[in-house]
């Protein structure tokens, strides 16, 4: 039985940009972040976040994309630490934490704070 070469061609895969956009919007929603707050986290504007919500893709190599990837690391690490419990994650994210020198939700609004929170969560996960 012969197979045409077109049936052997790889299927197109969803690009990294749309996947990153969808993931960062989902993580922000699960942590209770509003568009304005997410815009600060990824160094963007509220209008840009609105465009993301309507299908615009983030370029992973852009400044916004790199910050979005760091924010996803925060979410993924926190999700693993709380066993997938979004309510516990939201409580942790919005509670004063001496180890990150503030409230994580506020700290992630700056690049330095975002990196500090990522490093803290990575260290905590590393001890488990």
What do these predicted ranges mean?
Residues 1-128:
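Non-transmembrane "mature" sequence context
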């Amino acid at each position: 039985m012969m197979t045409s070469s077109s049936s052997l061609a790889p299927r197109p895969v969803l690009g990294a940009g749309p996947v990153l956009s969808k993931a960062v919007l989902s993580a922000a929603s699960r942590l209770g972040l509003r568009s304005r707050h997410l815009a600060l986290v990824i160094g963007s504007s509220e209008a840009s976040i609105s465009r993301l919500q309507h299908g615009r893709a983030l370029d992973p190599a852009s400044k916004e994309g790199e910050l979005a990837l760091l924010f996803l690391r925060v979410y993924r690490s926190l999700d693993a630490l709380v066993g997938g419990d979004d309510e516990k994650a939201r409580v942790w994210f919005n509670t004063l934490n001496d180890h990150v020198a503030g409230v994580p939700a506020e700290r992630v609004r700056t690049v330095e704070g975002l990196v500090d929170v990522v490093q803290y969560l990575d260290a905590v996960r590393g001890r488990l």
